[in-house]
């Protein structure tokens, strides 16, 4: 029976999506008005999404708090946190929920049919029948609440979203993104912050929170998406009978209104906080922003992706080069946001100064006028088109399911015109159209119309203010104290009581009979088979080649791995600088802008990285292998071009362009600073591990705080350091880019191998052959520092680390289960639910390194105390068989991720380089599947060993770190 025979639905459109190997169908549920879209294909990684148009009217963050709260229990699944129960006990390949400026979406994915149905069931129940109406405790936990432990205590505000957004508002990039959006749309929903402004979140009442759900969480306002290889008729019938038929079609006013164009550009100035010791000079962000039509124009939608590449994103692109040459900022970037109804094109200059605003605007507009007059670089346009078309055809979204990313892109048109859901799924004709326009003046006309003549734009200035965080914290504390002083004794007692009741609620465990309602798989549903390993050792042109034979749809993925042994410790940061400059500096035959375009016209791109491997059969020796890797991908007939361009980058790069090197150092410094605010948890964990782990110290010196300190020193003292920098880059390149230093990894089908071997001859004998200096083994010196790094952030990233193998405890597969147990039970309940942090996680690897870390955490000392309690938690670990099965299934879910061809090849090579055999993986899988509670209790020794190391690092607010200064051996400003 076809879906057309289902009487509950009306078929509105069918679409041949052959470029995506799919058939598209748009339906409407007759009774409820729910919109339903199907993408049928043979992809086993099935996706379900339900989304709602949720335009906020203020910055209280109600869409965001709602997204968190509906996943905290529902009618059929009345447990306190079904989301966490699913994470612990399902085979999901994706499970999350996301709040956007105008929509909220709830996607799930799984390859297992039974599991997929379970995920759909829990999510449908969550959005339509959440337990938020039963009491206000979920709202107070996830959103915000006053916290007063005793009548004489300090009144504070807590809440998961509240603390998450405090962290988000600490990042200048986050502030910039919000102010740009708000500045361009003062009269519609984009004028406010859907995630919530921490200053405004406490204005949200419980009743207004419930009103938001009543208004927007109705099938009439819903968008349901099903993707993959499944029985669509069965799913549609279930949706109808189980949920949609319970509702009548109701008009829901959720329309996203277009902003009336401006008659002149607006200017907005906003401050952001920097640490008291930071300089305000060269710390301003300037942004030039224009509104570009609507997302319903599929040609414009892609054309500005191409223009973003050609004008801004590519190294040496004209707008980027002009601003750098003028000295307006040190890191120039572009942004094209086509995920809102009216897309935004931005030119952003970081590390600039307020007084440069006029020059910033003048340089941009003069450069654009010159481009319109003299024509845009045609090769840059072709490179941009090929770059985006290659990615569309390859559909490699990394760890994210393909169907998930297609679904999110559908919303770019479907949300604003329900008759046009597929327009961005049929991109090949649009790419063909754009190729035809390269020589016609089409792109120049777009620049004139949308960037020069268009007055619907803004200039946004985000300028630094020293101590702003401390000032705002004091203002909030004074405000809360004044509020407390205004309360009667009865009102204060009521706050203390409410605080205690929320804590008691958080302490309560869900009833066993409620937990039993969450559908789970059994261990018998899990295969004991491991994923295949595709490694075949060959030799080509005298070099070891590891071939990974998989079907790649005609694309060859190659990596050249150069061994880094023999590089002394003091030169490690220079390896990373070398890795960063190659491909974006001039070579013998190309200026760097033309080099990048040449690569992207013919290939799928070339990139470089530093990787670390260890022989897992010899972990106690603490030896590891570091490699410099250059990776690229191309269609088989273009492999010769790919290797030719790799050779150009490795052997012909010009390190003598001092001006370009200084530009790159400034960009690196800026981006490292950004990463400390956005990914402080990984930075803190790495730094803490580096106190005793040579491998982690190598990583920190090439990608962490140690690296940042060297880059900062070089950039700020460039004139006196430049000769040393250039000499080091040349010497390291000559030392490592050698044929006798090389292993090749290549992923392709069998017929792609011969073409690769033939193409490789172009590079094999041109690598360095001159005699090397005598190599001295690299000795890495670790020093225990236990550091606190002060930033302008309002939240902390708190890391405890240690090596358990050093203390006589062996690795076991059960540690992978422990990661799930800690991250979604002990740490989740204590650090996130009770502590209010946005995230918390743990990790344990085969070489004995382990860590506990929190993310956007309002606490410091309290979190450290929670870490100390983990050993007792494990010693007393006691769950029933059903819960134990859930933890095991959640662990396997993390391991059994579907892989695209590139991932199959890179995983196989990773195992090869780490000396991990199929037998080891099979043993680990068996240890996971056969684990008992006693195995988990035995892991208390692992955590005791980790804590006994007494290694810690915290990145966070000046105030919190100074309050706990006795915790640290060193305190620094980052």
Model-identified regions with their sequence ranges:
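Generic recognition of flexible, low-complexity loop/linker segments
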Residues: 94, 210-214, 273-276, 319, ...
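His/Glu-based metal-binding/catalytic segments typifying zinc-dependent metallopeptidases
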Residues: 40-42, 49-51, 162, 166-170, ...
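Non-catalytic terminal extensions that flank enzyme cores
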Residues: 1-47
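Extended, regular secondary-structure scaffolds
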Residues: 211, 223, 232-251, 374, ...
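Non-catalytic, conformational "gating/processing" segments within enzyme and secreted inhibitor domains
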Residues: 158, 210-242, 704, 726-760, ...
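M16 family metallopeptidases and their MPP-like homologs
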Residues: 45-55, 81-129, 136-147, 174-199, ...
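Hydrophobic, small-residue-rich alpha-helical packing segments that form membrane-like cores
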Residues: 150-219, 225-243, 247-275, 280-282, ...
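Active-site His/Glu-centered metal-binding helix of metallohydrolases
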Residues: 62, 66-70, 578
């Amino acid at each position: 029976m076809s879906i057309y025979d289902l009487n509950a639905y009306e078929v509105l459109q069918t679409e041949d999506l052959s470029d995506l190997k799919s058939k598209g169908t748009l339906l409407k549920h007759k009774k409820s008005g729910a919109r339903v879209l199907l993408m049928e294909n043979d992809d086993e990684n099935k996706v379900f999404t339900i989304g709602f148009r949720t335009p906020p009217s203020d910055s209280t963050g109600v869409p965001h708090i709602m997204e968190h709260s509906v996943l905290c229990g529902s009618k059929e699944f009345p447990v306190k946190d079904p989301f966490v129960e699913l994470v612990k006990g399902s085979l999901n390949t994706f499970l999350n929920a996301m709040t956007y400026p105008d929509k909220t979406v709830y996607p799930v994915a799984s390859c297992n049919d039974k599991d997929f149905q379970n995920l759909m069931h829990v999510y449908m129940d969550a959005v339509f029948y959440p337990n938020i109406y039963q009491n206000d405790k979920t709202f107070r936990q996830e959103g915000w609440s006053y916290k007063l432990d005793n009548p004489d205590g300090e009144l504070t505000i807590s809440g998961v979203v509240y603390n998450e957004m405090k962290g988000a508002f600490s990042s200048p990039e986050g502030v910039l993104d919000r102010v740009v959006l708000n500045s361009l749309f003062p009269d519609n929903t984009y004028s406010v912050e859907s995630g919530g402004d921490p200053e405004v979140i406490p204005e949200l009442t419980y009743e207004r929170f419930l009103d938001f759900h009543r208004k927007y969480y109705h099938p009439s306002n819903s968008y349901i998406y099903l993707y993959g290889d499944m029985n669509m008729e069965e799913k549609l019938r279930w949706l109808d009978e189980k949920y949609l038929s319970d509702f009548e079609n109701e008009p829901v006013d959720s329309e996203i209104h277009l902003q009336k164009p401006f008659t002149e550009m607006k200017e907005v100035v906003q401050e952001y906080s920097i640490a008291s010791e930071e300089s305000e000079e060269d710390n301003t962000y300037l942004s030039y922003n224009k509104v570009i039509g609507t997302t319903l124009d599929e040609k414009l939608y892609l054309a500005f992706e191409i223009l973003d590449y050609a004008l801004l994103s590519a190294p040496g692109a004209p707008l980027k080069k002009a601003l750098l040459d003028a000295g307006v900022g040190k890191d120039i970037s572009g942004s094209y946001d086509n995920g809102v109804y009216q897309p935004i094109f931005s030119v952003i200059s970081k590390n600039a100064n307020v007084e440069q605003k006029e020059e910033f605007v003048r340089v941009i507009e003069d450069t654009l006028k010159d481009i319109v007059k003299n024509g845009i670089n045609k090769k840059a346009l072709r490179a941009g088109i090929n770059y985006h078309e290659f990615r569309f055809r390859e559909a490699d979204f990394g760890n994210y399911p393909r169907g998930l990313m297609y679904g999110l892109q559908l919303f770019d048109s479907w949300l604003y015109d329900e008759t046009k859901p597929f327009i961005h799924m049929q991109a090949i004709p649009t790419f063909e159209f754009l190729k035809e326009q390269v020589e016609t003046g089409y792109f120049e006309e777009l620049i004139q119309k949308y960037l020069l003549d268009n007055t619907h734009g803004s200039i946004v200035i985000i300028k630094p203010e020293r101590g702003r965080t401390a000032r705002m914290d004091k203002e909030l504390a004074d405000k809360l104290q004044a509020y407390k002083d205004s309360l009667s004794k009865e009102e204060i007692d009521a706050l203390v009581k409410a605080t205690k009741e929320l804590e008691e609620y958080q302490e309560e465990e869900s009833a066993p009979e409620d937990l039993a309602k969450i559908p789970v798989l059994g261990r018998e549903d899990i295969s004991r088979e491991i994923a295949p390993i595709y490694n075949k050792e060959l030799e080509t042109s005298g070099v070891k080649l590891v071939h990974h034979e998989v079907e790649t749809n005609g694309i060859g993925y190659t990596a050249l791995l150069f061994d880094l042994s023999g590089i002394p410790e003091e030169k490690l940061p220079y390896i990373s600088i070398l890795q960063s400059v190659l491909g974006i500096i001039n070579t013998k035959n190309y200026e760097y802008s033309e080099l990048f375009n040449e690569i992207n016209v013919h290939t799928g791109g070339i990139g470089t990285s530093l990787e670390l491997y260890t022989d897992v059969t010899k972990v106690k020796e603490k030896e590891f292998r570091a490699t410099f890797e250059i990776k690229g991908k191309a269609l088989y007939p273009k492999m010769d071009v790919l290797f030719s361009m790799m050779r150009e980058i490795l052997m012909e790069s010009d390190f003598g362009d001092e001006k370009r090197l200084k530009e790159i150092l400034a960009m690196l410094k800026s981006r490292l600073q950004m990463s400390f605010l956005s990914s402080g948890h990984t930075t803190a964990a790495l730094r803490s591990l580096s106190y005793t782990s040579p491998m982690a110290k190598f990583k920190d010196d090439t990608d962490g705080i140690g690296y940042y300190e060297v880059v900062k020193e070089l950039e700020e003292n460039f004139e006196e350091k430049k000769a040393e920098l250039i000499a080091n880059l040349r010497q390291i390149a000559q030392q490592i880019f050698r044929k006798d230093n090389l292993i090749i990894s290549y992923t392709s089908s069998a017929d792609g191998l011969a073409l690769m071997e033939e193409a490789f001859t172009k590079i094999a004998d041109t690598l360095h052959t001159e005699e090397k200096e005598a190599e001295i083994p690299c000795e890495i010196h670790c020093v225990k520092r236990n550091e606190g790094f002060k930033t302008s952030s309002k939240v902390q990233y708190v890391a405890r680390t240690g090596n358990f193998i050093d203390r006589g405890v062996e690795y076991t597969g059960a540690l992978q289960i422990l990661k799930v147990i800690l991250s979604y039970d002990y740490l989740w309940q204590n650090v996130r639910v009770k502590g209010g942090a946005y995230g918390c996680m743990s990790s344990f690897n085969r070489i004995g390194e382990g860590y506990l870390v929190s993310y956007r955490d309002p606490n410091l000392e309290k979190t450290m105390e929670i870490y100390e309690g983990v050993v007792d938690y494990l010693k007393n670990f006691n769950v029933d068989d059903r819960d134990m099965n859930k933890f095991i299934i959640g662990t396997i879910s993390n391991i059994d991720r579907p892989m695209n061809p590139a991932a199959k090849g890179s995983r196989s090579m990773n195992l090869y380089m780490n000396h991990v055999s199929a037998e080891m993986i099979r043993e680990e899988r068996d240890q996971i599947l056969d684990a008992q509670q006693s195995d988990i209790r035995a892991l208390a020794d692992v955590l005791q060993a980790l804590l006994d190391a007494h290694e810690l690092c915290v990145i966070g607010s000046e105030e919190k770190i100074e309050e706990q200064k006795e915790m640290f051996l060193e305190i620094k400003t980052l």
